Curated annotation (Swiss-Prot):
Disulfide bonds join 33-79, 133-168, 146-180. This is Cation-dependent mannose-6-phosphate receptor. Residues 1-21 form the signal peptide. Homodimer. Binds GGA1, GGA2 and GGA3. The keyword Disulfide bond applies. Residues 257-278 are annotated as: Disordered. Its main location: membrane. Glycans are attached at residues 58, 84, 95, 108, 114. PANTHER family: CATION-DEPENDENT MANNOSE-6-PHOSPHATE RECEPTOR, MANNOSE-6-PHOSPHATE RECEPTOR FAMILY MEMBER. GO terms for molecular function: protein domain specific binding; retromer complex binding. The gene is M6pr.
Length: 278
């Protein structure tokens, strides 16, 4: 009886530990972006853009600006919490002089849209201003520009707009290939003409070969269309080059002239008569 009792206790303990582990895993599951608006009425375009940025979810970006006591560090993550101290913070500002952390924007108030070669990611719901912008909540605007040579780089703060009564924001920029539009390849005019020429040559050779073989009944090299012309093409090209390039006539007249029979005088037979014997 005692062995069975110990076995049951072990199994119950294992089941209890498994239940606790599952519960803890649910609790520590990372939060993700929650688009502005009701869950069932979210923009399909915004959902598609967030899915497009998924390769950046596990990356963290940091940039430090300022000097001395005015040195600030900004930590940014895409649809993930950027801080362990502030719940839901997607972009935080840390004052290096006193390590004070300020939430610039939270991922539970996300808005995103894009253009041809850029994506604008906005985190709302940050910490409230103390004395600026009507004490409204801070807002982070991250401009992701197209750069086909990097997945994500060059995260930098650009400016802080807090001189207005409302709608203030922090502006940041970053480069990523995910913001680029798909490349559409177009053939140049020369390539199109080359393809057309090659197609015509192929049709000429194949069609002429079939005609010579099936209609004319030619065999061997005679099946090639216009064989005599192509065999004599070299001579034709040479004659054309000779005609265009030569500056002197091919047949230069001789420096002497022949004498015609009509120009020869009649030889007198009497001049030799004195040589005959008397």
């Amino acid at each position: 009886m005692f062995p069975f009792s110990g076995c049951w206790r072990t199994e119950l303990l294992l089941l209890l530990l498994l239940a606790v582990a599952v519960r803890e895993s649910w609790q520590i599951e990372e939060k993700s972006c929650d688009l502005v608006g009701e869950k069932d009425k979210e923009s399909k375009n915004e959902v598609a853009l967030l899915e497009r940025l998924r390769p950046l979810f596990n990356k963290s970006f940091e940039s430090t600006v300022g000097q001395g006591s005015d040195t600030y560090s900004y930590i940014f993550r895409v649809c993930r919490e950027a801080s362990n101290h502030s719940s839901g913070a997607g972009l935080v500002q840390i004052n290096k002089s006193n390590d004070k952390e300020t939430v610039v924007g939270r991922i539970n108030e996300t808005h995103i849209f894009n253009g041809s070669n850029w994506i604008m990611l906005i985190y709302k719901g940050g910490d409230e201003y103390d004395n600026h912008c009507g004490k409204e909540q801070r807002r982070a605007v991250v401009m992701i520009s197209c750069n086909r040579h990097t997945l994500a780089a060059n995260f930098n703060p650009v400016s802080e707009e807090r001189g207005k009564v409302q709608d203030c924001f922090y502006l940041f920029e970053m480069d990523s290939s995910l913001a680029c539009s798909p490349e559409v390849s177009h053939l140049s005019v020369g390539s199109i003409l080359l393809v057309i020429f090659a197609s015509l040559v192929a049709v000429y050779i194949i069609g002429g070969f079939l005609y010579q073989r099936l209609v004319v009944g030619a065999k061997g090299m005679e099946q090639f269309p216009h064989l005599a012309f192509w065999q004599d093409l070299g001579n034709l090209v040479a004659d054309g080059c000779d005609f265009v390039c030569r500056s002197k006539p091919r047949n230069v007249p001789a420096a002497y002239r022949g004498v015609g029979d009509d120009q020869l005088g009649e030889e007198s037979e009497e001049r030799d008569d004195h040589l005959l014997p008397m």
